[in-house]
Amino acid sequence: MSNNFTKVENPVLIVEGKQADNERLKAESDYLRGTIKDDLQDRMTGGFTSDNFQLIRTHGMYQQDDRDIRAERQKQKLEPLHNVMLRARLPGGIINPTQWLAIDKFADDYTSYGSIRLTTRQTFQFHGVLKPNIKLMHQTLNSVGLDSIATAGDVNRNVLCTSNPVESALHQEAYEWATKISEHLLPKTRAYAEIWLDEEKVETTEADEIEPILGSNYLPRKFKTTVVIPPNNDIDVHANDLNFVAISEGGELIGFNVLVGGGLAMTHGDKATYPRCADDFGFIPKEHTLAIAAAVVTTQRDWGNRVNRKNAKTKYTLDRVGVDTFKAEVERRAGIKFSESRSYEFTHRGDSFGWVEGIDGKNHLTLFIENGRILDFNGANSDSKALKTGMREIAKIHKGDFRLTANQNLIVAGVSAEDKTIIEQLAREHGLINDGVSNQRKSSMACVAFPTCPLAMAEAERYLPGLVDDVEAILEKNGLKDDSIILRVTGCPNGCGRAMLAEIGLVGKGPGKYNMYLGSDLAGSRVPKLYKENVDEAGVLSEIDALSARWSAERNDGEAFGDFVIRAGIVEQVIVSFRDFHHA
């Protein structure tokens, strides 16, 4: 059942007005080619100019600079230290040991930070790649069967899939659908291969032949898709535009419930922007998956707001035209009717750490990677963790694959009984297994933010470890040592850290200042509500102390923190985002 507006009288299907400049940019880009090749040859600047600054996103890159040294470089009359961040396309998050060793070496040899960053999009990122090494980076990925096509920009991005190593057969089929969806919705232009892999350009003039689904102007805004296997909502369906919820009978996949219109990004001070949970359109047999995916994407392509990019996501299109109208158009385009949704339930999120055995007899080891940062940390005493070296040593002997999770962790999957001991030994020797990690730390997550993200308003990744130290102490003081709160920090309101589905969500407002949101639930089916604005770091701890003390004293048996703050009247529940999220 929808918690949003199902019917809108006289819906506006097409938003009229002067289109955003990004629409001109895409139309003039020659199907995402632009003049990127020319920019690559320009060594007078380390960055990309004009339209190419935006266009490289559709090739999986963002132009960034090191913000820690930006001011000093300005004093020296130098341009910012431009570099790119690359996000790989990795449907379902699966990568094999050969591929891992290749990205490990590239990170060592050609990135400024020497790390591999696992992300909430179930893939990895390189940070700090300088212009002369960008083409080599893409060719390195290609040499091991990887790419970064459409992992950013106004396209369908990396397709997520539940990391479920136990239900091996079901997970395998769900993963295969994630891969099929990714391939089906990819841009068809050969721009990526021509620019980065030196493929010869083939001339064509028929726009529909080049981009039959995305169109010559691509999508109004980014579009995110997932495949999820209940009861674990590990990929946070309500953060995504399109979700296929696996329905099984007797352990076999029979089809999907289709959820449309989730999304978390917003803009501080703009009440026309808000996070929103997705609507359940109904059930489809699995053979209709690609047709429905294309129909949802093309409906959003044609009806999405190309005038105001802040209101261009699918969630706003649904609220503007009404869920029923959007759903009917999807059915018309696909030639398929949704049937009544099949029963399912999300009971939890997050990853289960340690060893599990799948029904295929293979063993799977889920490793907690704080903030997803795989690097050799050379701290004092017990703080030293050679995570990157450890992963390299495991990759050298591992015969299965690695599965990156949407919670920035990693599964060493498909381990035989005879290899379990050596895999665990390597993991422990290099700090990849730490039995002392608390439930609270495992329940906490942050986006990258400073020093690389140009949008960050406050710290996130660098702030979180110390914050969790303090929260652990607060919980223990309040008699909650064995409990945890889903805590997420994001450096800006764009939502990469999924703070808008946290029991406590901290959203950067300025240096050392955060807006504090409370009230999501354990299953991730509710967006939180603003509790306090512009809270400094000391204030954050003070509020968590007071709130957790009340939770400890007043909660019902087994009541989660997010449920408690709503029942206790600390914040109001957000039911309809458009109506409730900004309501004082």
From Swiss-Prot:
Q: Which GO terms describe its cellular component?
A: sulfite reductase complex (NADPH)
Reactions that this protein is recorded to catalyse = hydrogen sulfide + 3 NADP(+) + 3 H2O = sulfite + 3 NADPH + 4 H(+)
Q: What is this protein called?
A: Sulfite reductase [NADPH] hemoprotein beta-component
Q: What is its EC number?
A: 1.8.1.2
GO process terms (BP): cysteine biosynthetic process; hydrogen sulfide biosynthetic process; sulfate assimilation
Q: Which UniProt keywords apply?
A: 4Fe-4S, Amino-acid biosynthesis, Cysteine biosynthesis, Heme, Iron, Iron-sulfur, Metal-binding, NADP, Oxidoreductase
Q: Where does [4Fe-4S] cluster bind?
A: 447, 453, 492, 496
Entry's cofactor comment: Binds 1 siroheme per subunit.
Q: What does this protein do?
A: Component of the sulfite reductase complex that catalyzes the 6-electron reduction of sulfite to sulfide. This is one of several activities required for the biosynthesis of L-cysteine from sulfate.
Recorded hits in PROSITE patterns, A to Z, give: NIR_SIR
Give the matching PANTHER family: SULFITE REDUCTASE [NADPH] SUBUNIT BETA, SULFITE REDUCTASE [NADPH] SUBUNIT BETA-RELATED
For this UniProt entry, which residues form the secretion signal?
Answer: none
What does the annotation say about its assembly with partners? Alpha(8)-beta(8). The alpha component is a flavoprotein, the beta component is a hemoprotein.
Q: What class of enzyme is it?
A: oxidoreductase
Q: Which InterPro entries match?
A: CysI, NiRdtase/SiRdtase_haem-b_fer, Nit/Sulf_reduc_fer-like_dom_sf, NO2/SO3_Rdtase_4Fe4S_dom, NO2/SO3_Rdtase_4Fe4S_prot, NO2/SO3_Rdtase_4Fe4S_sf, NO2/SO3_Rdtase_FeS/sirohaem_BS
Sites where the protein binds siroheme: 496
Q: Which cofactor does it need?
A: siroheme; [4Fe-4S] cluster
| Recorded metabolic or biological pathway in which this protein acts | Sulfur metabolism; hydrogen sulfide biosynthesis; hydrogen sulfide from sulfite (NADPH route): step 1/1
Molecular function (Gene Ontology), one example: sulfite reductase (ferredoxin) activity
Its family remark reads: Belongs to the nitrite and sulfite reductase 4Fe-4S domain family.
Domain of life where this protein originates: Bacteria
